[in-house]
């Protein structure tokens, strides 16, 4: 556990430094905490706790303050405020954690999932108030390679999946050579948009389809083996929601975007640590055979 924590702290601190993160936000502040310490605490909070209060109570009983040189335990309001401030830096770190692992050519998949924004039970609302409460959902589009999240886009109001993908596409630092999508991606304009960028587009064609040069090519010879890699999206959606929750605790849009960014940093960080652990086990296993 301590080794994983030290590795994760080192990775996070190095990537935060690459973003030009200042040591302190203000010259005249008390200088109790350095900015990078808040970033690391927020990632650990999203990994191990469900609320700021729980994290503040959990933190003194761990080795984390010693590992990051913490002078005092921050309060809940400070952590909440810092998460919103650090959002652009954390969004960049989420991709920098994966960037060194990406090959020159790779297959990525995109898919949309939903996160609940209201935790009230419709049953009890009906029972007490006599009226049903409309459930709120945030739409979250993921771009995935293997078990890593390369990009994401969140919307609280309805927006088309392909339009969301085009929005997040601008923020992706390294584009895939092939993109797989479900039947929602069966659109000739969408295929042509990717082809203009030199990217191969794969999506199952709907029954009765006749039009479209790229769609007809997919009907004649559909690359099923490559398309099966889209199952990784379902795995990532399940693992992410199972580990970090299927709902958003923040109430404002700014807070929700910051919450998603921190959770994705934590997800990519521990996915990379687990991959490193498997690699070390394989090296040790191969060494025993010689």
Segments predicted by a language model, with ranges:
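Polybasic low-complexity intrinsically disordered regions
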Residues: 29-36, 43-47, 80-84, 88-196, ...
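Basic, amphipathic alpha-helical segments enriched in Lys/Arg and hydrophobic/aromatic residues
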Residues: 223-290
């Amino acid at each position: 556990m301590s080794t994983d924590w030290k590795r994760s702290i080192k990775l996070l601190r190095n990537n935060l430094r690459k973003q030009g993160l200042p040591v302190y936000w203000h010259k005249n502040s008390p200088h109790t905490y350095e900015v990078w310490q808040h970033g690391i605490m927020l990632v650990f909070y999203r990994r191990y706790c469900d609320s700021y209060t729980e994290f503040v109570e959990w933190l003194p009983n761990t080795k984390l303050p010693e590992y990051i040189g913490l002078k005092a335990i921050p309060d809940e309001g400070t952590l909440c405020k810092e998460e919103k401030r650090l959002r652009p830096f954390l969004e960049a770190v989420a991709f920098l954690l994966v960037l060194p692992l990406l090959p020159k050519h790779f297959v990525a998949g995109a898919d949309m999932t939903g996160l609940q924004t209201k935790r009230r039970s419709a049953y009890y609302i009906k029972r007490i108030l006599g009226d049903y409460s409309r459930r709120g959902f945030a739409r979250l589009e993921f771009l995935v390679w293997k078990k890593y999240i390369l990009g994401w886009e969140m919307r609280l109001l309805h927006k088309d999946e392909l339009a969301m993908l085009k929005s997040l596409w601008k923020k992706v630092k390294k584009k895939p050579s092939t993109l797989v999508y479900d039947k929602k991606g069966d659109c000739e304009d969408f295929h042509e948009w990717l082809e203009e960028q030199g990217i191969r587009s794969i999506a199952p064609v709907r029954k009765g389809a006749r039009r479209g040069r790229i769609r007809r090519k997919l009907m004649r010879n559909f690359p099923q083996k490559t398309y099966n890699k889209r199952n990784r999206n379902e795995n990532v959606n399940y693992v992410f929601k199972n580990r970090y929750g299927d709902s958003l605790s923040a109430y404002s849009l700014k807070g929700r975007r910051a919450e998603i960014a921190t959770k994705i940093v934590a997800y990519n960080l521990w996915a990379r640590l687990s991959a490193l652990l498997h690699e070390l086990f394989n090296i040790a296993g191969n060494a025993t055979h010689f």
